[in-house]
């Protein structure tokens, strides 16, 4: 289903790759043409709203489910959640070598939250534009997958980066943290500057690679869905979109798992004294 009577593939792709943006200077939404204007005081409202909304869904759902937990007659939802928790606990025990009660809950939150954000990619590409076009008589650019927004993925990885710095200083102390920067990998004072440059690059590359890996994989997956929708008529799209959607479920789960595991690994490295 196309958004314009005279279908144009570049315009179709461009429309689906734009965000619903809010101008913070006047608190007004930008229309599709305004999205070409680059402004520092503009935020991707769709990504922020959906990220917060899905986070609240997780909190409320887990809170309500926790009230119904029972040992005698567990329901299917409880069994599923227990399997997820056991899976994450086992990964934390195998990877994280310190003692920290925050790591397991943090890993659970990261895994479930990213999984739900990635899962939005399975919603049909044209569904929301179709609803707005036919019921509200307006065309708005909107992206339903928060993890295809580099601002979201980098923001999450920066939180992990701050935790790395925090636990490095907390466990090793300021002196130990500075030793890691200036005395690794070479202990000779001659290499202080070289060590600092090398370790700084290594430290800063962690959040960058963590955020860009998630963004790149999810963005590429969305691009394939858009190309399938744009190049094929609606009655042929299922031939490619259904197999790709099934395969994409694996990508969705895998990217959530990779982000979680790398977070545990980085925090374990930060908590280990040399």
UniProtKB/Swiss-Prot annotation:
Major subcellular location class: membrane
Where found?
A: Cell membrane
Q: Does Amino-acid biosynthesis show up as a keyword for this record? A: no
Its Gene Ontology cellular component terms are: plasma membrane; proton-transporting ATP synthase complex
What biological process terms from GO does the record include? proton motive force-driven plasma membrane ATP synthesis
Q: Does the keyword Cytoplasm apply?
A: no
Q: Which Pfam families match?
A: ATP-synt_A
What kind of membrane protein is this, topologically? Answer: Multi-pass membrane protein
Looking at the UniProt entry, the stretches that span the membrane are 40-60, 110-130, 149-169, 224-244, 245-265
Q: Which UniProt keywords apply?
A: ATP synthesis, Cell membrane, CF(0), Hydrogen ion transport, Ion transport, Membrane, Transmembrane, Transmembrane helix, Transport
Gene Ontology molecular functions: proton-transporting ATP synthase activity, rotational mechanism
For this chain, the family text in UniProt reads: Belongs to the ATPase A chain family.
Q: What does this protein do?
A: Key component of the proton channel; it plays a direct role in the translocation of protons across the membrane.
User: Which HAMAP family does the record match to this protein?
Assistant: ATP_synth_a_bact
How is the quaternary structure described? F-type ATPases have 2 components, CF(1) - the catalytic core - and CF(0) - the membrane proton channel. CF(1) has five subunits: alpha(3), beta(3), gamma(1), delta(1), epsilon(1). CF(0) has three main subunits: a(1), b(2) and c(9-12). The alpha and beta chains form an alternating ring which encloses part of the gamma chain. CF(1) is attached to CF(0) by a central stalk formed by the gamma and epsilon chains, while a peripheral stalk is formed by the delta and b chains.
What protein does this entry describe? ATP synthase subunit a
Gene for this chain = atpB
């Amino acid at each position: 289903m196309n958004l314009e009577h005279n279908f144009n593939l570049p315009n179709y792709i461009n429309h689906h790759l734009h965000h619903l943006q809010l101008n913070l200077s006047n608190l007004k939404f930008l229309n599709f043409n305004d999205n070409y204007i680059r402004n520092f005081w503009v935020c991707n409202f769709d990504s922020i709203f959906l990220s917060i909304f899905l986070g609240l869904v997780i909190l409320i759902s887990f809170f309500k489910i926790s009230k119904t937990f029972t040992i005698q007659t567990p329901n299917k939802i409880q069994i599923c959640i227990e399997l997820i928790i056991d899976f994450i606990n086992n990964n934390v025990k195998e990877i994280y070598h310190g003692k920290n009660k925050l790591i397991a809950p943090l890993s659970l939150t990261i895994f479930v939250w990213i999984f739900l954000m990635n899962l939005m990619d399975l919603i049909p590409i044209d569904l929301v534009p179709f609803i707005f076009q036919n019921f509200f008589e307006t065309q708005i650019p909107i992206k339903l997958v928060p993890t295809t927004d580099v601002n979201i993925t980098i923001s999450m990885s920066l939180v992990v980066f701050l935790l790395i710095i925090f636990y490095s200083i907390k466990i090793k102390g300021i002196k130990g943290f500075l030793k890691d920067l200036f005395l690794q990998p070479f202990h000779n004072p001659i290499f202080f500057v070289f060590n600092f440059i090398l370790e700084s690059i290594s430290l800063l590359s962690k959040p960058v690679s963590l955020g860009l890996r998630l963004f790149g994989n999810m963005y590429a997956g969305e691009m394939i869905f858009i190309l399938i929708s744009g190049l094929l008529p609606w009655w042929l799209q299922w031939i490619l979109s259904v197999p790709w959607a099934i395969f994409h479920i694996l990508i969705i789960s895998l990217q959530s798992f990779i982000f979680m595991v790398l977070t545990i690994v980085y925090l374990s490295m930060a908590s280990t004294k040399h």
